[in-house]
C-alpha cells in the first residue's frame, strides 16, 4: 500500500487526505465539460423542497429527485437524453481509493456532482437508492473546505465531524455503508481554482 494519509472514522470509513490533489485541474476540467452537456440544476425533494446544492450527473446512471421520488435513471428526465459519459479519471480515482481502503475492484457506474455555493448544505441522509449495498461509496472534495457530518445507522445518533479540504476523498462501506451523512452550510471563502465554490463528486455502483 502506498504512503497515504488516512484519517479514520472507523475501520470501514476513511478520509484519504490530499488523495486527489495532484489531479485537481484535470477533475475540474472534466466537470466543466460535463456541465456543457448537462448543466447544474437545483433538484426538488418528493415533498417539493428545493435542495440548496445544485447537481448534475455523469455515467451510465444518474441520481434524480422529484415528485416521483429518489431514484437512478439511465436518461435525464428533463431532456430524455443519456447522461454524459463518466470520465476515466473519475472512475480510476474512485477505484484506486476504494482499493487502498480495502474495497477491491470497485466499479462505479454513477457519479453525482454537487456544486455548493456559500450557505448551501446537505442534511443528514442515507445513500440507499442503490441495488447492491456491498459496494462502497467514494466521495471527492474540490474547492472550499466544509464540515462533513458522519452519523450512525439511525438519524438520532450524534454525528462525528471532520473538515474536508480540497483533494480529500472519503470512502465508506461494509457495516458503515448505510450510515447517515451530510455537510454543514458552506462558509464564505475563496479557493484559487474555483473561487467561492465547493464541488463534490460522489461515485457509486447504482445497478
What are the roles of these predicted feature ranges?
Residues 1-207:
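Non-heme Fe(II) oxygenase metal-center motifs and adjacent flexible, charged/small-residue loops
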